[in-house]
Amino acid sequence: MDYPLNNQPATDRYDRMQYKYCGKSGLQLPLISLGLWHNFGSVDNFSVATDMIKYAFDHGITHFDLANNYGPVPGSAETNFGRILKENFQGYRDEMIISSKAGHDMWAGPYGGNSSRKNLMASIDQSLRRTGLEYFDIFYSHRYDGVTPVEETIQTLIDIVKQGKALYIGISKYPPLQARIAYEMMAKAGVPCLISQYRYSMFDRAVEAESLPLAAEH
């Protein structure tokens, strides 16, 4: 760790990272973001998790990506991140892009793991409480569940922005047909889709066929 002795982020942190505009928005994101899917749950070492967040921010990584079911235990990554934020980054919230998602299994019963309005509204309120935040910079529908009408899910995301619980919205792992419906519905409502999150690497380039060109159109 090359954190200063006064435990404050390095003053040259923004010189250590490049940033690009996200889609057609005015929001810049770092070329590298930190996902909290692993290493930040209640079964992990909290001190190590804290050091990772500090090191990332110290090197210009401003985007921290959560989901309500990240852990393990589900929800614990958001809780731990909220604690890290409170204990180490007072005064730096406006320099961070914090995102979360909902749509995978989170609690028992028929309302705890789909993309319905019921689930998404409950989920974002729970996530805000766990993190101690007043809003998320980005909130995603974590998946198309194959049952909930896309229109219901997307209208809920639009309403979440209008309620001030998120600044931007996005989708994750949506098939092309449902993604097109989402993009067009968001644009018509004046709340365009900021970002689409897919599995994409040198070893998995399937999204190049349809999903990436479709996203580029919008």
Segments from the language model and where they lie:
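Short, acidic/polar
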Residues: 43-57, 114-131, 152-155, 179-183
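Active-site mouth loops of central-metabolism enzymes
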Residues: 35-47, 106-121, 142-148
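Active-site beta-loop-alpha junctions enriched in small/polar residues
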Residues: 37-39, 67-69, 101-105, 141-144, ...
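Structural preference for beta-strand elements that scaffold enzyme active sites
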Residues: 21, 29-33, 62-63, 95-99, ...
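N-terminal binding-site loop/beta-alpha segment at the start of enzyme catalytic domains
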Residues: 1-96, 162
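Structural motif corresponding to the early beta-alpha repeats
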Residues: 91-115
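Active-site groove signature of glycoside hydrolases
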Residues: 128-149
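Beta/alpha (TIM)-barrel catalytic core signal, keyed to glycine-rich beta->alpha loops juxtaposed to Asp/Glu
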Residues: 2-16, 144-218
